[in-house]
Design a protein with these regions (language model features):
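Canonical positions in the second alpha-helix
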Residues: 39, 88-89, 123
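TPR alpha-solenoid repeat register
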Residues: 49, 99, 132-133
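A donor-sugar binding/catalytic signature common to diverse glycosyltransferases
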Residues: 160, 353-399
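Leloir-type glycosyltransferase catalytic cores
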Residues: 226-271, 396-528
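Catalytic donor nucleotide-activated moiety binding site of glycosyltransferases and closely related
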Residues: 278-291, 305-349, 467-471
Length: 543
């Protein structure tokens, strides 16, 4: 319903029905909440009223922050009231599982990840208790949340980790099942088909309807949080831990490209001008438009395709081809030799996207979901303009460089310690950076090209790291372990490697070797999220 309204809003908010849209928006966000507030004042134990008001205010909170000139403090007051409503729901009815889920999501949007995870863990424990009460745990099944598995291709990386967790006995026992409701959108149906060997996908309407009542008691949401053994972990941290275990045992990737996809994929490439046997690199640079819509909350993850031209020319000069991935909403590329703008090709298809990700020499990516496909096939990643750093879940074969953050208050770059620690490392929405008065700084064309060169040299067997390079690398890895970059994992360093030249260039941002020296740090007022600044913001775990 919400998605339909947002789509309608995108279509009509600037058209002939603009006035009607804003009238509807005013009524929904200003009048309806007052009606619910009045109802709650008359009936303080009205659970559906609290829940409906909480969801309405959560939507208003998101809408307020999606505008370019948003007021973070005003929006935070709305978000705080939404949080209070969800807290009240689970206080009045501890078995109201949906209340935990929305409360947890609200806490994340307010920058309170620790509390959000605690609430999510409480929800998991309550769910398990209810399943045992009704003996549903004896069925030997678990449902995978369809929100992550179908709506976003990026969330499929957590399905990959979820399946691997089963191998290690780290997830709740049970046959994994994914329900696809009638009319439910699937981002890439062909990629989902590859996972049918590991999970049972059910789309028959009658069967889905019969099983849906069981979902709330037996559902796992690997795109949000995972119970790994006895520890409930934030999804990127869970994936990082599982990927490390998988790599340490030298296990192969779960997916292998089918013979049919291999043959027709190379036939399609030939149509595009790429000779069979040529090597190619895929490139995906996230831009506003595809998922952002009217929202700017993911703006910090975007980058400019023009800053990748130098790296493209480098690949071509070394005998390769570049396949630019994406969709037609993206900025078109100018014509370049041995560069194919597949994002604007009439030959785009879901199966071809899978083929390209599985067959490329490596993928140059930003903080976008396509990396989930390549990772599932074991293809190396070159992660550029990467944020947030808590999502650095990939393997030692992958390289990355993060965006840096400039403190507008102190007129300096954040150190790696600050960048790799909460609250910056766990800031998943643009307004969280705005509140800390941080300007997110994109990688330069030279920095991107240096990282691509490093991967090319590595794959060619020509890469050399000096003793100083290794020392800098270990200092950064140690920093990520000590400061909890992978949130919730104690003394667990990131596994992927930061770009050699990037680290050389910004070595001054590493902790000082001489501990007697001092360096300015962000003050408490700069690092606190607005939710922490308002009175009566009680910890939901105390209720």
């Amino acid at each position: 319903m919400i998605g339909t309204l947002l789509e309608w809003a995108r279509t009509h908010k600037e058209g002939k029905l603009r006035a009607l849209f804003w009238l509807y928006r005013w009524f929904r966000f200003s009048v309806v909440p007052l009606i619910y507030e009045r109802g709650i004042s008359l009936r303080p134990d009205w659970i559906p009223g609290y829940y409906a008001l909480g969801n309405l205010l959560a939507l208003k909170h998101s809408s307020m922050l999606s505008t370019r000139d948003h007021d973070v403090r005003k929006a935070s007051k709305v978000g705080q009231r939404a949080l209070e409503c969800f807290q009240k729901v689970i206080t009045l009815d501890p078995e109201y599982l949906e209340g935990y889920q929305d409360c947890s999501s609200m806490l994340v949007s307010m920058g309170k990840v620790a509390e959000a995870l605690h609430v999510a863990e409480r929800a998991f424990n309550m769910q398990r208790s209810l399943a045992e009460r009704y003996q549903l745990d004896r069925l030997g099944i678990r449902f995978i949340s369809s929100v992550g598995a179908t709506n976003s291709i990026g969330a499929m990386v957590h399905v990959d980790a979820y399946v691997k967790a089963e191998v290690f006995g780290l997830k709740p026992p049970g046959k994994p099942i994914l329900l696809v409701k009638p009319g439910q959108s699937i981002h890439n149906p062909h990629f989902l088909n590859y996972w049918r060997q590991y999970i049972t996908v059910i789309s028959d309407p009658t069967t889905v309807e019969c099983l849906l009542p069981l979902v709330r008691y037996l559902e796992d949401a690997p795109h949000w949080g995972v119970m790994c053994g006895k520890q409930f972990l934030y999804h990127p941290s869970a994936a990082a831990m599982i990927y490390k275990l998988w790599e340490d045992e030298r296990r192969p990737p779960l997916l292998t490209l089918s013979r049919d996809d291999y043959e027709r994929g190379w036939d399609r490439l030939k149509q595009m001008g790429v000779p069979k046997g040529a090597w190619f690199v895929c490139l995906h640079v996230r831009e506003a438009g595809f998922k952002d819509g009217i929202s700017s909350q993911s703006a910090y993850r975007n980058a400019d395709i023009e800053t990748y031209l130098l790296a493209m020319k480098n690949i071509v000069a070394r005998g390769g081809w570049v396949i630019r991935m994406g969709n037609p909403t993206m900025k078109p590329l100018s014509i370049m030799e041995h560069v194919i703008d597949y994002a604007h090709s009439e030959l785009r298809s879901d199966w071809m996207e899978v083929f390209l990700c599985a067959q490329c020499r490596f993928l140059i990516n930003t903080s976008s979901g396509v990396g989930a496909v390549t990772a599932s096939f074991g293809v190396p990643l070159v992660l550029t303009n990467y944020m947030p750093t808590c999502a650095l879940l990939y393997s030692s074969q992958d390289l990355f460089i993060p965006k840096l953050c400039w403190s507008m208050d102190q007129q300096r770059y954040l150190t790696f310690e600050e960048l790799m620690s909460p609250p910056v490392s766990t800031s998943v929405l643009q307004h969280q950076y705005d509140y800390m008065n941080l300007k997110v700084v994109d990688n330069s064309p030279l920095e991107i090209n240096d990282l691509v060169t490093e991967m090319l040299d590595r794959l060619d067997g020509a890469l050399v790291y000096s003793a100083e390079d290794e020392q800098l690398h270990e200092r950064l890895r140690t920093l990520t372990a000590v400061n909890g970059t992978l949130y919730g994992l104690d003394d667990f360093p990131i596994n992927c490697r930061i770009g050699r030249d990037f680290l050389r260039k910004h070595a001054s941002l590493l902790p000082l070797v001489d501990e007697s020296e001092t360096r300015p740090t962000l003050s408490c007022s700069e690092t606190e999220h607005p939710a922490n600044s308002f009175p009566n913001n009680e910890d939901v775990t105390n209720e």
